[in-house]
């Protein structure tokens, strides 16, 4: 049995965390040989809810769950953390401009980044789930200058999984059969779910689906799936977001040779400028994401990728005083 790992979850009394924490406690992030200790961070008014969640976690008697700590203090929450899921965020208010939403969330993620910088373990990995996730991750990263930038990710895995699900439904194939799907860009309506390189059972996906369906139905449906779920369910995606967060962190830590979509800091690959965090085609090796290199980019792809870059640069400009 390995030494325990400390995992911090923010917004611990919320709906996403309610699904996420059981998966973590069951050993699905670090594996069946690694115990976990949970730090649950909440705002003071929600500590009672977090306490109730902790009681239920204890009642589940997970063999790998060695400790639960509940706090509203940032420094305590991130002390010694090996992994952090930044789930808690301020939702968009009615009529609120996106710039105001970005600024209000920056006031949450900036201090969290500083606390991570000052108190987390050296091997800390941070996954931002709370939206607008890409720029929230940029803000947290910018406030943690002593932590390698590669340790800050935003979640595109939900979009990746949604894309595969739509393709499986369309083609009648199993989700597990699809490879080399990628979602480029921002976790927003501008995102670009890309099937250019995708295969299923050795066949090119682009040969199995109509191009008009791909452009006019598939891409917008994946991008707007969250809104579709809210309309049908009356609540935002929670269990699927939690499941995708586990997928991302597990693959980041344990590795994967198959492609995954991960929002990571740009290092200039595919002509994308540095200074933004965006979804890219990646594999995970030795605990680090590596961008899949050597892909040919056509004009259609370039236009979609560039639109995401422009959007993310605009978001960065809106929060430049927080970076």
Curated annotation (Swiss-Prot):
Substrate binds at residues 92, 98, 131, 162. The active site is at residue 187. It holds the Pfam family Ldh_1_C. One of its GO terms (biological process) is tricarboxylic acid cycle. Keywords: NAD, Oxidoreductase, Tricarboxylic acid cycle. The keyword NAD applies. The keyword Oxidoreductase applies. Its EC number is 1.1.1.37. InterPro entries: L-lactate/malate_DH (IPR001557), Lactate/malate_DH_C (IPR022383), Lactate/malate_DH_N (IPR001236), Lactate_DH/Glyco_Ohase_4_C (IPR015955), Malate_DH_type2 (IPR010945), NAD(P)-bd_dom_sf (IPR036291). It catalyses: (S)-malate + NAD(+) = oxaloacetate + NADH + H(+). GO terms for molecular function: L-malate dehydrogenase (NAD+) activity. NAD(+) binds at residues 11-17, 105, 112, 129-131. Catalyzes the reversible oxidation of malate to oxaloacetate. Belongs to the LDH/MDH superfamily. MDH type 2 family. This is Malate dehydrogenase. It comes from Corynebacterium efficiens (strain DSM 44549 / YS-314 / AJ 12310 / JCM 11189 / NBRC 100395). The gene is mdh.
């Amino acid at each position: 049995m390995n030494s325990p790992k400390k995992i911090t979850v923010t917004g611990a009394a919320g709906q996403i965390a309610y699904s996420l924490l059981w998966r973590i406690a069951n050993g699905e992030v670090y594996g069946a040989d690694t115990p976990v200790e949970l730090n649950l961070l909440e705002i003071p008014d929600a500590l009672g809810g977090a306490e109730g969640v902790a009681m239920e976690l204890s009642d589940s008697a997970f063999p790998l769950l060695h400790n639960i700590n509940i706090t509203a203090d940032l420094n305590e929450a991130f002390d010694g953390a090996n992994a952090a899921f930044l789930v808690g965020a301020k939702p968009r208010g009615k009529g609120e401009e996106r710039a105001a939403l970005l600024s209000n969330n920056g006031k949450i993620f900036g201090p969290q980044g500083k606390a991570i910088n000052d108190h987390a373990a050296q091997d800390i990995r941070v996954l931002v789930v709370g939206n607008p996730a890409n720029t929230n991750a940029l803000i947290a990263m910018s406030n943690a200058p002593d932590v390698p930038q590669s340790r800050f990710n935003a979640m595109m895995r939900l979009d990746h999984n949604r894309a595969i699900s739509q393709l499986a439904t369309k083609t009648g194939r199993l989700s597990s059969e699809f490879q080399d799907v990628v979602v480029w860009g921002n976790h927003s309506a501008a995102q670009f779910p890309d099937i250019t390189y995708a295969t299923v059972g050795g066949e090119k996906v682009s040969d199995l689906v109509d191009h008009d369906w791909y452009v006019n139905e598939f891409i917008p449906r994946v991008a707007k799936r969250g809104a579709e779920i809210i309309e049908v369910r009356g609540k935002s995606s929670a269990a699927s977001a939690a499941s995708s967060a586990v997928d991302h962190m597990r693959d980041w830590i344990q590795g994967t040779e198959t492609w995954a979509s991960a929002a990571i800091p740009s290092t200039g690959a595919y002509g994308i400028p540095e200074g933004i965090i965006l979804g890219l085609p990646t594999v995970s090796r030795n605990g680090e994401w590596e961008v899949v290199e050597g892909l040919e980019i056509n004009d259609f792809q370039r236009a979609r990728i560039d639109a995401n870059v422009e959007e993310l640069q605009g978001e960065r400009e809106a929060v430049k005083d927080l970076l």
